[in-house]
From Swiss-Prot:
Domain PLD phosphodiesterase: residue ranges: 219-246, 399-426
Originating gene: clsA
GO cellular component, one term: plasma membrane
Keyword Iron found: no
Protein name: Cardiolipin synthase A
Transmembrane residue ranges: 3-23, 38-58
NCBIfam families: bac_cardiolipin
Source organism per UniProt: Salmonella typhimurium (strain LT2 / SGSC1412 / ATCC 700720)
Biological role stated in the UniProt entry: Catalyzes the reversible phosphatidyl group transfer from one phosphatidylglycerol molecule to another to form cardiolipin (CL) (diphosphatidylglycerol) and glycerol.
Gene3D superfamilies according to UniProt: Endonuclease Chain A
Lineage top rank: taxon: Bacteria
UniProt-listed GO biological process terms: cardiolipin biosynthetic process
Amino acid sequence: MTTFYTVVSWLVILGYWVLIAGVTLRILMKRRAVPSAMAWLLIIYILPLVGIIAYLSVGELHLGKRRAERARAMWPSTAKWLNDLKACKHIFAQENSSVASSLFKLCERRQGIAGVKGNQLQLLTDSDDVMQALIRDIQLARHNIEMVFYIWQPGGMADQVAESLMAAARRGIHCRLMLDSAGSVAFFRSPWAAMMRNAGIEVVEALKVNLMRVFLRRMDLRQHRKMVMIDNYIAYTGSMNMVDPRFFKQDAGVGQWVDLMARMEGPVATAMGIVYSCDWEIETGKRILPPPPDVNIMPFEQASGHTIHTIASGPGFPEDLIHQALLTATYAAREYLIMTTPYFVPSDDLLHAICTAAQRGVDVSIILPRKNDSLLVGWASRAFFSELLAAGVKIYQFEGGLLHTKSVLVDGELSLVGTVNLDMRSLWLNFEITLVIDDTGFGADLAAVQDDYISRSRLLDARLWVKRPLWQRITERLFYFFSPLL
């Protein structure tokens, strides 16, 4: 009996070290960023069982076998559709401004199409204005409505949007709604999901959370896009979820969420439509390619329109493109660079680019919320402040609520707005969308919004920052070490 237990003990020990060695080898062979690899190895060797389970759950990008097969299967038809779109040469911009030229070339070569011109674009910064405009457009819809949101929280004006969408479905408009399973858990637990389906709306719970499949697909891979397309001509995107700020997370202690949305008319809706069709096919297996370009692209005034490129990121889309786009935009800055984001945990490359821009004389400002709904990200963000301040970057802490806007403005002409936070999750994991706009008029509108944010912010004083308590510095460094995993 003693011999038996001895053999079992040695087998357990051997299996333990084989498992650790196997996971270690897998981490090293994945060619991931060094800080990320080191953070994972530290967790695994300090807390082996916890670390191994965590790594197998969220350490690698698993879309899931069925979704991965759908993603591969959809690309031949999607590629053909994109080639057909290229035949509509009149919608594509032939030239871009000097500050935007490199970024637009990058997007064209990586995504296969150039930026589209002739779009009408309006910035909306008030949640009531966004929802009222959306309700009007839904009421005027003639053919189809497609929506995707990370969060749909019942209550307030969000219910009015839901009512208008159900009314549209009842009068024969083809309505599709895709919501992230984790972000919209309150919606799927409410009567609204059944009510919408009964009204004729196709409601899809994207990336459904299932603990039984935790090792087969990353549960923290989320559908983070916020998009609305109406009649293949009107489109919305930006940072705002389908929530009424007066009813959303009121117990979080951060104030109302402050967002920005863009309402567009023109060919950009077609580009966003193909992104939505890919998401829909990956999730449901059903192919819903937008109508042929020559059918849905309506006349437009080229002289007064905006040139826009759409960047889609996430599994199945060009890898690392949004990260490359942010780096390219940052290095293109010559006069000033303004960034707004609720969550700031940049890659080493992006941090270096921002600091380098400030050190070569660019006026660099980053606007962050003073209070954050994520304790982990809040502390991790602070770990970067010293390096930014030393480089000459201005850090503004917004005091008017939780600033949720994701925007970048370069030299008043090149703008990026969308759903991407400046953190690892948005840059390399989630399904996201970003608009790249080459236009001084839109740049002026975005600058006015950012100036308003600055007027409601407090500039971080570098002299006071270095005097913060020791315990805060220790906490910041702790979270900084694990920032590659956040």
